């Protein structure tokens, strides 16, 4: 009996570990736009409200699980819809590499779509979990993902669903937190088309109406360059200046503004799939770095 119980326990743990590993394979390429920055904002809320260390640890752990499910729902739906494209462009993704079957991914998506809002309800952020699910359905099953405006709105409104939930896991959203959320929402909505520079040929082949295909690659690059060039002004005025003229705020202002200017130059001067992929990764890291800065600018 003891041996059977031990074997059962081992089987359960192996299954759990395998599911955690598979979920990581699905979400790892999106961690810089979801899991890492959102967890930073949870921690910023904890610092702002002066939570004791033990409560802070619980809030952060709760946030990590919430945003793991948050991005897992997106990546499961996204990779199921884009399977044929991924066979050509992204051979390491789980559905293409055989780490997960299509049927397994569909079952996982059903499970996540049930578990995610329930967990959101438990944490007191149900409205934001449901907003994210509505956006996901519109993006992957409602056609938003095939048009530049829908794609940008999905990313932009998704910032609201992400960051409002992150803060409310700890406390009600403050006016200062809303200032950050609104600023980043507008920024992401306007500039998210940088992701569509990476595979213009593939998007054209599948009939996707991305911004570079609708307005032209050159015009899109000029627009994005202008947006990133104006970035330092928005960063300073809306995110950094309200925190006061401390040296660490000035240093952060310079770093974030400098990275924004670097992106402005890259988007027009560094072209090609590999360069555009690198540019997009820098955008993701800029977003995470900005939200890491909220730890001491919103305290």
From Swiss-Prot:
Cellular localisation: Cell membrane
Catalytic activity: (2E,6E,10E,14E)-geranylfarnesyl diphosphate = somaliensene A + diphosphate; (2E,6E,10E,14E)-geranylfarnesyl diphosphate = (-)-somaliensene B + diphosphate
Organism this protein belongs to: Streptomyces somaliensis (strain ATCC 33201 / DSM 40738 / JCM 12659 / KCTC 9044 / NCTC 11332 / NRRL B-12077 / IP 733)
One term under GO cellular component: plasma membrane
Pathway stated in the Swiss-Prot or TrEMBL entry: Secondary metabolite biosynthesis; terpenoid biosynthesis
Enzyme Commission number: 4.2.3.216, 4.2.3.217
Transmembrane segments: 32-49, 56-72, 110-132, 153-171, 177-194, 222-241, 247-269
Described function: Sesterterpene cyclase, which converts geranylfarnesyl diphosphate (GFPP) into the terpenes somaliensene A and somaliensene B.
Chief site of localization: membrane
Bilayer topology term: Multi-pass membrane protein
Family membership: Belongs to the UbiA prenyltransferase family.
Keywords: Cell membrane, Lyase, Magnesium, Membrane, Transmembrane, Transmembrane helix
Name of this protein: Somaliensene A/B synthase
GO molecular function: lyase activity; transferase activity, transferring alkyl or aryl (other than methyl) groups
Lineage: Bacteria, Bacillati, Actinomycetota, Actinomycetes, Kitasatosporales
Needed co-factor(s): Mg(2+)
Pfam families listed in its UniProt record: UbiA
Gene3D superfamilies documented for this protein: UbiA prenyltransferase
InterPro entries for this protein: Prenyltransferase_related, UbiA_prenyltransferase, UbiA_sf
